[in-house]
């Protein structure tokens, strides 16, 4: 989809709320967009998205904003790669929640929603207490 857009920097809100988008987002969706920075609300509210392909964002180290990226994608299942760690998105870790707030809010069918996804990222895990929040 974005193969011929090597200078792409932002897809903020591009497909937000589009019910027609269904299935898996390919793991290599942004493989040619190594400089992409802003994915805020990219597919937020797209209830038809069911999963992320292997390696999603693995080669996109310039990402600085995933605010509400998958907010409300309530049919996503499986285990999400830990984009909240330095390994995946080194420029958005830390305490500036405006860059990642509620990225996975409402994605409660994810296998690691309660066990790994931090509450500030929209998950149910509280790193401070080491416990999931109900």
Segments and roles (model prediction):
Residues 1-134:
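Negatively charged
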């Amino acid at each position: 989809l974005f193969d011929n857009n090597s200078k792409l920097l932002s897809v903020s809100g591009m497909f937000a709320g589009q019910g027609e988008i269904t299935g898996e987002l390919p793991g290599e969706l942004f493989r040619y967009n190594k400089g992409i920075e802003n994915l805020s609300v990219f597919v937020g509210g797209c209830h038809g998205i069911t999963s992320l392909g292997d390696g999603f964002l693995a080669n996109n180290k310039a990402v600085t904003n995933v605010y509400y990226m998958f907010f409300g994608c309530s049919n996503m299942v499986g285990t999400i790669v830990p984009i909240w760690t330095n390994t995946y998105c080194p420029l958005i870790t830390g305490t500036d929640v405006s860059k990642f707030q509620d990225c996975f809010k409402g994605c409660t069918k994810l296998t690691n929603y309660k066990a790994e996804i931090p509450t500030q990222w929209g998950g149910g895990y509280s790193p401070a207490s080491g416990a999931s929040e109900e």
